[in-house]
Design a protein with these regions (language model features):
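Catalytic-loop motifs flanking and including active-site residues across diverse enzymes
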Residues: 65-68, 87-91, 135
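Predominant activation on well-ordered alpha-helical scaffold segments within soluble catalytic domains
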Residues: 17, 70-74, 89-96, 105
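FAD-binding core of flavoproteins
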Residues: 93, 101-167
């Protein structure tokens, strides 16, 4: 059994290692706080085709495997890139499984859309505990027995951080 990366996988790893070395210096990571997101970096990242990795080719994506996404995530993590790639990849794949190859999902391959999942079912009011929720344009959520796709402009501001509050 050969566990080495294929040539295509090695090319993905090399591409994103170089991309993040060039595009994500420490100063850029620091400037992305407290939101933890850099919109300009996301647009550059999307230009590589990475935002469409969770989508089939028919929707403008590349239909790559989770292993390919893991290689991108490893490169992203190595530079602490302030991007919601894993959230977007997982949500994109799940949306395709739920909705099929609906053309409305093609927007997720572009530089302006970010998808994510609500971690808990919505009982009333807005969804809570949504990774990348402050920047996501598409949120997949469960409400009772229905799966909902919520699309609206993200708030663009972080939730209050109570970690440093006095007890």
């Amino acid at each position: 059994m050969d566990l080495a990366l294929s040539q295509d996988q090695q090319a993905i790893e090399d591409l994103f290692t170089t991309f993040f070395e060039n595009e994500c210096p420490t100063e850029r990571v620091r400037k992305a706080e407290p939101l933890g997101f850099d919109a300009d970096l996301w647009e550059r990242f999307a230009e590589t085709g990475a935002s469409g990795m969770g989508l089939p080719e028919s929707l403008g994506g590349s239909g790559t495997s989770p292993l390919d996404a893991a290689l991108v995530a490893e490169s992203l993590g190595r530079r602490l890139a302030p991007l919601p790639f894993i959230e977007h990849f997982v949500a994109s794949r799940l949306l395709v499984r739920c909705m099929g190859e609906d053309p409305v999902l093609g927007v997720l391959a572009g530089p302006k859309a970010i998808a994510t999942l609500a971690l808990h079912p919505i009982t009333r009011g807005p969804a809570h505990l949504v990774p990348a929720g402050a920047v996501a344009s598409h949120v997949l959520a469960l409400a009772k027995s229905e799966v909902l796709l919520c699309t609206e402009d993200p708030p663009g501001r972080p939730a209050a951080n109570f970690a440093a509050s006095p007890l």
